[in-house]
Amino acid sequence: MTAVTRFAPSPTGFLHVGGARTALYSWLYAKSQGGKFVLRIEDTDIERSTQEAIDAILEGMEWLGLTWDDGPYYQTKRFDRYKALINEMLEEGKAYKCFMSSAELDEIREKQKANGEKPRYPGTWRDRTDHPEGEPFVIRFKNPLEGKVLVKDHIRGNIEIANSELDDLIILRSDGTPTYNFCVVVDDWDMGITHVVRGEDHINNTPRQINILQALGAPVPEYAHVSMILGDDGKKLSKRHGAVSVMQYRDDGFLPQALLNYLVRLGWSYGDQEIFSKEEMIELFSLDAIGQSASAFNTDKLIWLNQHYIKELPVSEVLPYAKWHFEQQGIDVSNGPALEEVIKVQADRVKTLKELAEISGYFYQEYEDFDEKAAKKHLRPVAQEPLEAVKAALMALSTWNAETIHEAINKTAETLGVGMGKVGMPLRVAATGSGNSPSLDVTLNLLKPEQIAQRIDKALIYIANRQQS
C-alpha cells in the first residue's frame, strides 16, 4: 500500500508554527515511505475563509520547501460530491432530517447541564417521519447506538470510545452547506489518504469520522494525533510568546532549513542528534517516534540553529534568502562586492539574515552618519594623523588585496610608532561607519580604493568639525 498523507489547513489565518509542524510530519512520513503528500484547503467556513489566508498558507509551504504532490484541493469546489453522498445516506437510512430549532436544542442542553449530564442532542428526530413542510432542517448522521469505536493512533496507542458517548452529528447545515466533519471524511476517502497526521485537538472528531467512514463503506486511515506546542511558560503558544506565523520567521531573518530542523525536534527525536538535513529527516523519520507530551517552544534554541545553518550551509544555499533581506532594506547588491563574499565574511557574526543585511549595507551604499558611540571614541583629533597616513599608504598600493592592505596598515602603525588599534579603529569607523566589522583587511578588500579614500576624507571632516565645536 502506498502511503498517502495530507495537510488540510483552514484558511482563516496565516500558517502558524503548529500547523507547519503538522505539515512537516505529514510530508516527512509520505516521503519516507515513497508515498504522496496532498494539500487540501478546508474552506467550508465561508464567512471566515479568505483568499489572503489561502495565499499566506501556500506561500509558507513553498518557503519551507514542503512541496505537495496533489492539490491544492478546495472543499468549496466539492460541495456537489458531498451533497450527493448525503442524499444517498438519507435514502439508505444512515442519515435523517432534524427539524429541532437552535432555541429548542439550547434549552435541552441547559437542562442537561443543570442535571449534571453531558450536553448533547437527544436524537429527537432520529426515527420520526412526521416532517413539517416548509420548515428549516439540518441533516444528521445516524451514529450507532451500541458498541465501541477503536481509534488506532501511532502516537497514543489504541483509544476506545463508546458509541453511547457520541451524539448524532450534523452533516448538512440548514443553509445547505455540508459540515467540516463530513467533508473531511469524504475527502480522505476520495483522495486515498492512508495516514492522517493532525493536532490532538481533533481527537474528539476522530471516532465520529470513523463511524461515518464505515457507514460509507470507506477504508479507515491510520491516525497520529500530535500534541500541542507550548510557550516557554508552559501555556499554549500564542503571539505573546513572539512570532507564531511562519512568514514572520522569514521576515525576521530565519532560514527555512533552521525552522524545519527546529520544528521536527518539537516532539520527534532520533537519539541525541540535534542537526538534521531534510534528507536525514526523510531517512530517519517515523510516526511511532513522536512523543505524547507537549513540546515547549524555545526561541533561543531556534536562534542557535539559525546561526548554525548560516555558518554551515553552502553559501549558494544561503544566497537567495540573504538577497531577499537586502532587497527588503532597499539595498542593491549589484552596487558592490559579490554577495557571496559578504556572506562568507559576516556568517560568523550574525544570528539572522535580517541582521546580516542590517550590518552589511556599507558594502553597497554610503552610510549617512557615523555610529555615534564609535565616532565619539575613535574619531578624535588624535586620529587625524593616523588616518591621513594610512590613506596615503593604501592609495599607493599597486595591488589591492587583503594581504597588501594588512601590510599597509601595519607599516603605517610602525612608522607612527603607535599600536595597530590607533590606526585600525579610526580606519574601521571611517570605512564602515561603525566600530564593528569583519577583519579590517578583509573588509577593505571588498570595498574599492576610491570608496576608502572618500570615507577617510569624510572621517577627517568629522574630526575637523569636532575640533571647532
Swiss-Prot record:
UniProt protein name: Glutamate--tRNA ligase
GO biological process: glutamyl-tRNA aminoacylation
Gene of this entry: gltX
Positions of short motif 'HIGH' region: 9-19
Chain residues that bind ATP: 239
Protein family (similarity comment): Belongs to the class-I aminoacyl-tRNA synthetase family. Glutamate--tRNA ligase type 1 subfamily.
Span(s) of short sequence motif 'KMSKS' region: 236-240
Pfam families per record: Anticodon_2, tRNA-synt_1c
SUPFAM superfamilies: An anticodon-binding domain of class I aminoacyl-tRNA synthetases (SSF48163), Nucleotidylyl transferase (SSF52374)
Source superkingdom: Bacteria
Organism: Pseudoalteromonas atlantica (strain T6c / ATCC BAA-1087)
Record localization: Cytoplasm
PANTHER family from the UniProt entry: GLUTAMATE--TRNA LIGASE, GLUTAMATE--TRNA LIGASE, MITOCHONDRIAL-RELATED
EC number: 6.1.1.17
Function: Catalyzes the attachment of glutamate to tRNA(Glu) in a two-step reaction: glutamate is first activated by ATP to form Glu-AMP and then transferred to the acceptor end of tRNA(Glu).
